[in-house]
Amino acid sequence: MAFSRLSFAASLIVFSSLIISSVAYYGNEADPETGKLIPIAVEGIIKCKSGGKTYPIQGATARIACVKVDAYGNELVPISILSSKTDAKGYFIATIFPSQLRAGRTVTKCKTYLYKSPLADCDFPTDVNKGVRGQPLSTYRILQDKSFKLYWAGPFFYTSEPTYY
């Protein structure tokens, strides 16, 4: 009986920590050396899946949308930015700098979406890795020079045929 209560308590603690981490605030972590807020960056890959082939799309863009939060924790209007156009390997990057927000504001609940494909024969977005519904940002790494919190999104896919969800 005591063991089941202990395991229930442990499960409750783990579950609550998962909930807390799922509503993470992005871009509000200060560099311990300078005290300045660290910008966030999102990188990923966008590809075309047509028939049995998959290949990177050059010139595609992704959209990153976040909710702004004030110093009191109140959610404000969302912020949305577009990534750079993908390179020949389908790679994109987007950044949100603290200077894009008013003082005392941070962002939360960030998601990455497919935005635009330049290919007329591969321009239907798919929901693979939540490219249509939005993939929440979760794990990140801080770059060595502490200049960015770097998140990974995708890979995302467009297709030549419409997909209905």
UniProtKB/Swiss-Prot annotation:
Tissues in which the protein is found: Root hair and seed specific expression. Also observed in other tissues including siliques, roots and flowers.
Location within or outside the cell: Secreted, Cell wall
UniProt keyword Signal, yes or no: yes
Inducing or repressing factors: Accumulates in root hairs within five days under phosphate (Pi) deficient conditions (at protein level).
Example GO biological process: ethylene-activated signaling pathway
Gene Ontology CC annotations of this record: extracellular region; plant-type cell wall
Signal sequence, renumbered to the chain: 1-24
Keywords, sorted A to Z: Cell wall, Developmental protein, Ethylene signaling pathway, Secreted, Signal, Stress response
Keyword tRNA processing: no
Phenotype on disruption: No visible phenotype under normal conditions. Short and abnormally shaped root hairs due to the suppression of cell growth and cell death, and withered seeds, both having a tendency to necrotize and thick cell walls with abnormal structure in phosphate (Pi) deficient conditions or after ethylene treatment. Production of dark brown shrunken seeds unable to germinate, especially in low humidity.
Main location: secreted
Record family assignment: Belongs to the plant proline-rich protein superfamily.
Function: Contributes to cell wall structure in root hairs and seeds, especially in phosphate (Pi) deprivation conditions or in the presence of ethylene. Particularly important in maternal tissues (pericarps and seed coats) during seed development, especially under stress conditions. Confers thermotolerance in seed germination rate.
PANTHER family: OS01G0164075 PROTEIN, PROTEIN SEED AND ROOT HAIR PROTECTIVE PROTEIN
The name this protein goes by in its record: Protein SEED AND ROOT HAIR PROTECTIVE PROTEIN
Species this chain originates from: Arabidopsis thaliana (Mouse-ear cress)
